[in-house]
Amino acid sequence: HSDDFYSQPDWDVFQVRYTSADGYRLFAWLSVPHGDGPFPAIVRMPDYGSVHDLVYTSLRERAVVMNPTYRGQRQSDQVFQAKYPGLLTEGIEDLGSYVMRRVFADALRSMDALTGQEQAELGPVAFMGAGLGGALALAVAARREDIHAVAANTPMALGNPASLQPGLAYPLAELDDYLRLYPARRDVVKRNTADLDPITLAGKITAPVLLSVGINDTGSCPLKFGEELAEKIPDCDLRVYHGASEGGGHEHAQIQISWLSDKLGLG
């Protein structure tokens, strides 16, 4: 239904609810520009945190913008409330109970929810995200050829051996914390996270990708991992910054808007 509080003179905001794996109900914000479509669409995947709210973008006046959530986040937490820290290892000892696998399934369902909505006719679709959101955006693009562009900032290395190194910052450090408590489960952790590795999925991505990394990032996308990921993505524009998990910060945000505008035909 429409949300009068967040709607603006140039766009309307809707609250969207849809069903994911295991019948889990999810929430998303959807904004639709005024005027006649079709409109290009941008899906901003959620990072690792409890709240994923509407975020300002100058493209909202010209594109449909979707802000989905995954299970455990605010407004998608009626059944399960995610813990931060803690979500990365919730149920990790068993393939069937590992919550992060369902988080990735939730990401895939966001594309279905977008294409199934009736508020606007859609043109080309881009996915974007930072941290976990960057990894989710890449994962969806690897499985959906109808995505036209991906802008991923410091995508989380979950599933890659780089995520299990000691001495990392959070949130990846949650994995090392877990293995210090349960050292005998290292092989189980490797096995149950392996197919979430962005590098494993990278070769399947057909869309162009704008990838940003920070040379001091040890909590989400370590530099060596990011560089290897860029090599595996068939069409990747890698930008390296002297930052950490924020990547290029405001500077890269401006580049990203210009890049997305070009890929979506917004001029």
Regions from the PLM with identified roles:
Residues G86-G131:
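Gly/Ser-rich "nucleophile elbow"/oxyanion-hole loop immediately N-terminal to the catalytic nucleophile
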Residues A139-A184, G248:
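Hydrolase active-site cap/lid region
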Residues H1-D36:
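N-terminal cap/lid segment of alpha/beta-hydrolase-fold proteins
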Residues G23-L26, V32-A41, V51, R60, ...:
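Proline/glycine-enriched tight loop/beta-turn segments at coil->beta junctions
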Residues K224-G267:
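C-terminal catalytic histidine-bearing segment of alpha/beta-hydrolase fold enzymes
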Residues I205, L211-V213:
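Short beta-strand/loop motif that positions the catalytic acidic residue
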Residues D53, T57-A105:
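Cap/lid segment of the alpha/beta-hydrolase catalytic domain
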Residues I215-C221, E246-G247:
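Acidic catalytic loop of the alpha/beta-hydrolase fold
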